[in-house]
Curated annotation (Swiss-Prot):
Name the record gives this protein: 2-aminoethylphosphonate--pyruvate transaminase
Organism superkingdom: Bacteria
N6-(pyridoxal phosphate)lysine, modified sites: 194
Quaternary structure and partners: Homodimer.
Catalytic activity, as annotated: (2-aminoethyl)phosphonate + pyruvate = phosphonoacetaldehyde + L-alanine
Organism encoding this protein: Bacillus cereus (strain AH187)
Pfam families: Aminotran_5 (PF00266)
Enzyme Commission number(s): 2.6.1.37
Annotated function: Involved in phosphonate degradation.
Broad EC category: transferase
Biological-process GO terms, alphabetical: organic phosphonate catabolic process
Record InterPro entries: Aminotrans_V_dom, NH2EtPonate_pyrv_transaminase, PyrdxlP-dep_Trfase, PyrdxlP-dep_Trfase_major, PyrdxlP-dep_Trfase_small, SP_NH2Trfase/AEP_transaminase
Gene3D superfamilies found in the cross-reference section: Aspartate Aminotransferase, domain 1, Type I PLP-dependent aspartate aminotransferase-like (Major domain)
Cofactor: pyridoxal 5'-phosphate
C-alpha cells in the first residue's frame, strides 16, 4: 500500500496510519462470531477509556457520521415533556439546537461569541429561572474555532440543579483525558474518525446505564433509537441492529490498539498539545495570529486570523495541497479565519514542513 497522497491537517477525517488503512483491505460478515466479539471488545475498550467506574456505563455504536449519534441521543433521551438547555458558541452547538427544533423538543439557548467559552454565570442564571429544563447539552471542543468549553463546570451545575447532562465530545474524546463518572456526564458522544484516529463510518455514545434504561420507548426515530440499538448489541453479543460498517469497525479496533501502544490518552494529548503549541509559535513567526485566547485553546484545531485584506485563502489552500497538505477554511461569520488541525497521525516534523510550505507562499509585513 502506498503512503498518503497528502497530509490531512483537519479535525476529522484525519490522517490515519498505514496499518489502520491496511485492515480495510479484507471483507467481513456482519453475522460472523469473531466480528461480533470484536464489536464487544470495542465497546468495552471505549468504556475503559471513558471512566474507571466501568460497571456504571455502557457503549452504543451507531452507523453514520457523528451527527447521527448526536441526533440519536437528542431524539431518544429527552421525553416528550422534556426541555433542553443548549450551550452554544459555534456551528456544532447550533446544530444541536436545530435538531431539537426539528424534533419538536422544547429548547432554550445560552449563547456566547464563537471565540469565547460557555458563560457559566449565564448558564446558572438560566437554570435558576427556568425550572422546566430537564437536560443540558454542551460541546466540549467546538471545532468551529478550536475553543474548549468548561464541561467540568457545566456538568457540575447541571447536577446541582438535577439535570441530565449531554456532552458532545466529538473532537476531544481519545485526545483529552475525560472521566465521565467524575465529571457526572450522563451521555457522551464521539466518532470513529477523530482523536482515536479511525476512519469515518460510525459514531458512539457512552452512557450511564441507569439513564439509558429510562429511554425505552422514547425515540422519535426507528433507525436512531438509542435504547433499541443498545438492547440489540447487548442481547445479541455485539450484533448491530442494522447493517454495520464492518471495514470501519476493523479499522477502529486497530486504531484503539495503536492508541494503547502510544501510551493511552495522556500520551496522545501530549503529542497533540505539542503539535498545537509548535504550530502557533511557528505561525506567529511568519505573521499569523490565532483567534482563540491561549487559555481557551484546544490541542485539536487552531483558527488563524487572515493577516491582511489581500490574503487569499484559496490560493494558499491550493499551494499547500500541491505541497502535500490539506487544511480547513474558517467557519465563523464575524472574523475571516482559516483552520489547521493538529490531530491524526501528525508529528512535530510534519508541523515544521507545513509552516515552511506556508512561509514560501505568504510574505507578511
Amino acid at each position: 500500500m502506498t503512503e498518503n497522497h497528502y497530509l490531512l491537517l483537519t479535525p476529522g477525517p484525519l490522517t490515519t496510519t498505514k496499518t489502520v488503512k491496511e485492515v480495510m483491505l479484507y471483507d467481513w460478515c456482519t453475522w460472523d462470531v469473531e466480528y461480533n466479539m470484536m464489536v464487544q471488545q470495542v465497546r468495552a475498550k471505549l468504556v475503559s477509556l471513558a471512566t474507571k467506574e466501568e460497571e456504571r456505563y455502557i457503549t452504543v455504536l451507531m452507523q453514520g457520521s457523528g451527527t447521527f449519534s448526536v441526533e440519536a441521543v437528542i431524539g431518544s433521551v429527552i421525553p416528550k415533556n422534556g426541555k433542553m438547555l443548549v450551550c452554544t458558541n459555534g456551528a456544532y452547538g447550533k446544530r444541536i439546537v436545530q435538531m431539537a427544533e426539528m424534533l419538536h423538543i422544547d429548547v432554550v439557548v445560552s449563547q456566547t461569541e464563537e471565540w469565547e467559552p460557555t458563560n457559566i454565570v449565564e448558564v446558572e442564571k438560566i437554570l435558576q429561572q427556568d425550572k422546566e429544563i430537564t437536560h443540558i447539552a454542551v460541546v466540549h471542543c467546538e471545532t468551529t474555532t478550536g475553543i474548549i468549553n468548561p464541561i467540568v463546570d457545566v456538568c457540575k451545575l447541571g447536577k446541582q440543579y438535577g439535570k441530565v447532562t449531554l456532552v458532545d465530545a466529538m473532537s476531544s474524546f481519545g485526545g483529552i483525558e475525560i472521566d465521565i463518572a467524575e465529571l457526572q456526564i450522563d451521555f457522551l458522544i464521539s466518532s470513529a474518525n477523530k482523536c482515536i484516529q479511525g476512519v469515518p463510518g460510525f459514531g458512539f455514545v457512552i452512557a450511564k446505564r441507569d439513564e439509558l434504561l429510562k429511554c425505552k420507548g422514547q425515540a422519535r426515530s426507528l433507525s436512531l433509537d438509542l435504547y433499541d440499538k443498545w438492547e440489540t448489541m447487548e442481547n445479541q453479543n455485539g450484533k448491530w441492529r442494522f447493517t454495520s460498517p464492518t471495514h470501519v469497525v476493523h479499522a477502529f479496533y486497530q486504531a484503539l490498539l495503536e492508541l494503547e501502544k502510544e501510551g493511552g490518552v495522556k500520551a496522545r494529548y501530549n503529542r497533540y498539545d505539542n503539535n498545537q503549541k509548535l504550530l502557533v509559535n511557528r505561525m506567529r513567526e511568519i505573521g499569523f495570529k490565532p483567534l482563540v485566547d491561549e487559555k481557551y485553546q484546544s490541542p485539536i484545531i487552531t483558527s488563524f486570523i487572515y493577516p491582511e485584506e489581500w490574503f487569499d485563502f484559496e490560493q494558499l489552500y491550493n499551494e499547500l495541497k500541491r505541497d502535500g497538505f490539506v487544511i480547513y477554511p474558517g467557519k465563523i461569520s464575524k472574523v475571516d479565519t482559516f483552520r489547521i488541525g493538529n490531530i491524526g497521525d501528525v508529528h512535530e516534523a510534519d508541523i515544521h514542513r507545513l509552516v515552511d510550505s506556508i512561509a514560501k507562499g505568504v510574505v507578511i509585513g
